[in-house]
């Protein structure tokens, strides 16, 4: 970011950043009778650098310089294996895991010492994971269930960031090199039915996450960016819980006409029962598709309900409900033996004014958009 040409700013900022990554991935697949396996080895090296330089309007005064990412090197190497057994024509078991080694080094660790005195410049973490699953097919029905366990290392920003501005909640963020690994426990299940005319599937999963990493307001420290409302430091909650459920369905009304629908819901809470931010409210999608000879017609509705479980404590405000209606039509023909498709349509036909739970600053999404396209398939 370079805002040195904006005269209205009291302090101009120049914030370049670089991230360089190289690595390798190697896979091997094994298959014998009813047993199969995939073994994967991956490794990478990343260097993250971000600078922050402030220029006062009076250039005769001294400028301020800091590293937002203080030359952080990350090296990772991991080995994973996934095994599956067809125990019958109708059922299968999956079992696997991985073991990774994550190394971090901050070249200019003195920036981290301001908030975390004496923290070491280097840190090595062991990242294990395990998962198991079972699938069962009975005629038109399908069932599955699974369990998982895994570790996640803090990201570069979570561990070593220094006054990184988040425009969503308008806070400057400070990393913490002493954060523990996030430890996740997962349970998931699904059930479905499908025949020649229709299908319906329900999926549910639950996560219990120890040492959940999130930003909390700090009582010490002043914001660096003049737009900031405060400073947050990354810290670990004792735990967090995340629950997701979805329902998908499709139905062929007759040969030329079919419909699809989806309903999803998520809920996430911290160790005090408070809401976590960036969790989508109850949402839906529904569509109809009609085909007759070379003609096609599609219409769809999608939207979110009002965000009830939002999180003011983490800088989030409520997002109202919205619905978006889209329509389109197309015609397919051959032009000199080349398949050609002409399409016209409208997105957000009713010109709904809306933003989603994930849009920073509540900046509205696109309004009514009428389009046409020509596709030529050689």
Predicted ranges, named:
Residues 24-30, 79-85, 99, 132-138, ...:
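Residues on the lipid-exposed face of transmembrane beta-strands in outer-membrane beta-barrel proteins
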Residues 49, 102-114, 138-186, 206-229, ...:
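Surface-exposed extracellular loop regions of Gram-negative outer-membrane beta-barrel proteins
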Residues 12-27, 76-79, 174-180, 186, ...:
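Outer membrane beta-barrel strand-and-loop segments of large Gram-negative receptors
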Residues 89, 93, 101-102, 205-209, ...:
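Gram-negative outer-membrane beta-barrel transporters
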Residues 1, 39-47, 95-101, 145-149, ...:
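Transmembrane beta-barrel strands of outer-membrane/channel proteins
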Residues 31-35, 88-92, 137-141, 184, ...:
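Outer-membrane beta-barrel channels and translocator barrels
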């Amino acid at each position: 970011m370079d805002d040195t040409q904006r005269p209205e700013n009291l302090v101009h900022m120049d914030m370049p950043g670089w991230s360089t990554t190289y690595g390798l991935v190697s896979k091997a697949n094994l298959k014998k009778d009813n047993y199969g396996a995939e073994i994967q080895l991956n490794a990478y090296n990343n260097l993250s650098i971000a600078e922050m330089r402030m220029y006062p309007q009076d250039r005769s005064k001294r400028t301020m310089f800091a590293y937002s990412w203080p030359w952080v090197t990350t090296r990772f190497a991991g080995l994973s294996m996934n095994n599956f057994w067809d125990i019958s024509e109708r059922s299968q078991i999956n079992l696997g895991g991985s073991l990774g080694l994550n190394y971090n080094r901050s070249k200019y660790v003195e920036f981290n010492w301001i908030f975390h005195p004496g923290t070491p410049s280097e840190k090595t973490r062991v990242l294990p994971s395990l998962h198991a699953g079972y699938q069962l097919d009975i005629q038109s029905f399908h069932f599955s269930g699974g369990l998982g366990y895994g570790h996640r290392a803090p990201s570069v920003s979570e561990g070593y960031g220094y006054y990184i501005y988040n425009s969503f909640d308008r806070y400057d963020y400070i990393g913490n090199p002493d954060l523990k690994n996030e430890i996740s426990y997962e349970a998931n299940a699904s059930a479905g039915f499908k025949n020649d005319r229709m299908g319906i599937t329900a999926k549910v999963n639950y996560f219990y996450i120890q040492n959940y990493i999130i930003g909390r307001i700090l009582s010490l420290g002043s914001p660096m960016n003049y737009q900031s409302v405060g400073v947050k430091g990354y810290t670990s909650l004792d735990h967090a819980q995340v629950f997701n459920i979805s329902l998908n369905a499709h139905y062929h009304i007759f040969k030329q006409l079919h419909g699809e629908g989806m309903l999803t819901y998520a809920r996430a809470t911290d160790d005090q029962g408070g809401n976590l931010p960036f969790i989508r409210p109850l949402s839906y999608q529904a569509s109809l598709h009609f085909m007759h000879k070379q003609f096609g017609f599609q219409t769809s509705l999608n939207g979110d309900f009002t965000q009830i479980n939002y999180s003011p404590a983490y800088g989030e405000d409520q997002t109202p409900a919205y619905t978006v209606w889209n329509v389109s039509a197309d015609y397919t023909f051959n032009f000199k033996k080349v398949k050609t498709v002409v399409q016209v349509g409208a997105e957000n036909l009713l010109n709904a004014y809306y933003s989603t739970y994930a849009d920073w600053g509540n900046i509205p999404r696109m309004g009514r958009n009428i389009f046409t396209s020509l596709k030529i398939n050689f």
